[in-house]
Amino acid sequence: MKKLLAITVFAVMAMTAGAQSLNKMTWFNEPASYDIKGNTLVMDVPGHCDYWRISHYGFTVDDAPFYYATYGGEFEAKVKISGDYKVRFDQAGLMIRIDKENWLKAGIEYVDGKYNLSTVVTHHTSDWSVIALNRPVDHVWIKAVRRLDAIEIFYSFDDKTYTMMRNCWMQDNTPVQVGLATACPDGEGFKAKFEGFQVKHLPDQRRLEWLKAHADN
């Protein structure tokens, strides 16, 4: 009984949450203009930048802004996103990245005058999936949950009800960069806003299962 109680306490203590301090994060492809106030980042997204590898279009680009912190283990990351999207493929979202050949990005992408919930998953080559929205939205929350060797991506319009938009593989037991990404492949730039970015550590699922299996030993 005491060991089962200890397992419960361990799990609760491990699920710590809090806003990630934006001032302690790192830029990859730092934009010329941005502003951080509290837990809000407003970015002037530069034009003609993107993340994509090979498939369909035949080119590789890795030159868009990404503001991140590095995390190991299992976690839940969440952020509120809005943007003044202007031209085709303007986008803002959450990015999880191991290296230039292994990453995902998920958020809002503006395509042919419509808002889309967009996810690109890359393992050497990129794929792209979208959920078309029937109306413009002022903002969206994107949440990513990393468990074992998978990442689940969810969206919400009220930060209460979340719907899954993608489940994909990502190498486990490997530190990843988690943060805020934008892209503007076709245009001259736009303004994007990120609010309330937070990462909650989750107790390692394999360790919890081991503890339960050995609770009476």
Task: Say what each PLM segment does.
Residues 1-21:
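Bacterial Sec-dependent N-terminal signal peptides
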